[in-house]
A protein has these predicted regions:
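Short cysteine-rich clusters marking metal-coordination/redox-active sites
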Residues: 11-14, 37-40, 58, 70-73, ...
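A metal-dependent hydrolase signature that marks the N-terminal structural subdomain at the beginning
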Residues: 104, 117, 124-257
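Post-HExxH zinc-binding segment in Zn-dependent metallohydrolases
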Residues: 298-342
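Short metal-binding segments enriched for Cys and/or His
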Residues: 34-50, 66-72, 97-103, 129-132, ...
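Active-site scaffold of zinc-dependent metalloenzymes
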Residues: 243-283, 290-297
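Canonical RING-type zinc finger of E3 ubiquitin-protein ligases
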Residues: 16-28, 44-53, 76-87, 108-118, ...
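Cys/His-coordinated zinc-finger cores
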Residues: 29-43, 57-66, 88-98, 120-130, ...
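Pan-zinc metallopeptidase signature
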Residues: 131, 159-170, 180, 219, ...
Length: 375
């Protein structure tokens, strides 16, 4: 912009000839009093001004009208600003009044953050004070992790690093493994070891309480004395005589009397259970084997494998359900989901029959007809 004194220029503002000083700006000449702000219409004079769409503005008027306004204090924003949900904010207004605050330290969150249970956290605050810790290595669980049946949280990679307890499915890291265990023995976690049935007196106390429970469900044993044995895996395999696989945990002890190669009678002597089972599983195995014993005592022979094993699994399942503790619910779920065509599918078929008929009627029909009720 320049001020000049010449002859008869025409003012763009009023269209009249200019006598005296005038302004040359925006490619035109102006009376000084006619070169005005497009907003307030007051002369701009020789001060700094802004141009927008070919129109002049006082700098203050320009910023007041054209600059974004802070959605919090409603004042114009002339420098850097933050946007949030389509609104603009002064940095200080945003940080003090708008930005999310860490649920732990209550300071503004300006960068990346974690959300947990609808609350926001600084990454460091979440990592150091909020994130769950791996039950095995203690590291904060910041990404995908595993939660097992027991609610134990741990790093996903540990699934391929540590063996699982043979009885409850918990992972067993090296520091929790039994140092004296033979390589042929199953891995047990500290929880299962803590309740393991290792001695016959222990076992007998628990076993004695089972028969009254089964009697109350209509399974009579006629006061026949049933012995209980605790055996190792080698002895259990001998007693099974190849009748079951390596996963067997118990066996019914029977004596078969034959005449002229014909079975004349079968006697039940008791049951044998693998030593070292956790107490809840021990009881469930005992109930299963007592199911086999009851079938023999009632003279029920020749059932299909799925029917006999399914019936015995049903007894264990009902026992676990009545016990209704974490361990029993875990074992009951294992029975429900067992993919084995004999034990798993057998249980599901027998369970459906018993549900349809009612358990007491189902047992009585089985006892009197000596065969599995029709599906």
């Amino acid at each position: 912009m320049s001020m000049a004194r010449t002859s008869q220029p025409v003012c763009k503002g009023c269209g009249q000839s200019i006598n005296g000083y005038y302004l040359t700006v925006l490619g035109a000449t102006w009376h000084p009093e006619h070169f005005v702000c497009a907003i307030c219409h007051q002369p701009i004079g020789d001060t700094q001004f802004n141009i927008h769409d070919g129109k002049p503005y006082h700098t203050e008027c320009y910023h007041d009208r054209m600059d974004p306004r802070c959605a919090y204090c409603h004042k114009s924003i002339t420098g850097q600003y933050y946007t949030h949900n389509g609104a603009a904010y002064h940095p200080e207004c945003y940080q003090e009044h708008i930005v999310s605050r860490c649920e732990y330290c209550h300071k503004p969150i300006m960068g990346q953050y974690y959300t947990h249970e609808s609350a926001s956290y600084h990454t460091a605050c979440y990592r150091d004070h909020v994130a769950p810790r791996c039950a095995y290595c203690g590291k904060p669980l910041m990404s995908e992790y595993v939660v097992d049946h027991w609610g134990t949280k741990y790093c996903k990679e540990h699934q391929s690093q540590y063996p699982k307890c043979a009885y409850c499915g918990r992972l067993v890291p090296p520091q929790q493994q039994e140092q004296a265990a033979m390589s042929s023995e199953r891995v047990r976690c500290p929880f299962c070891r803590a309740s393991a049935i290792e001695s016959l007196p222990q076992a007998r106390i628990l076993f004695q309480g089972l028969l009254p429970q089964l009697n109350a469900q209509g399974l009579q044993y006629n006061n026949i004395p049933l012995q209980l044995e605790l055996v190792d895996r080698v002895r259990l395999a001998q007693l099974l005589h190849g009748r079951s696989g390596a996963d067997a945990l118990g066996v019914t002890l029977q004596s078969t009397h034959m005449l002229n190669k014909q079975i004349v009678r079968t006697e039940v002597n008791g049951i044998a259970v693998l030593r070292g089972l956790p107490s809840t599983l021990f009881l469930g195995v005992c109930v299963h084997e007592l199911g086999h014993a009851w079938l023999t005592l009632q003279g029920i022979q020749g059932l299909a494998s799925w029917a006999e094993e399914g019936f015995c699994e049903l007894l264990s399942y009902r026992f676990y359900g009545k016990l209704n503790i974490d361990e029993s619910r875990h074992h009951a779920e294992g029975i429900e989901k067992n993919p084995d065509p004999v034990y798993g599918e057998g249980f599901r078929r027998v369970h459906a029959m018993a549900d349809r008929m009612g358990f007491q009627r189902f047992v009585e029909t089985l006892r009197t007809t000596k065969r599995m009720p029709s599906a």
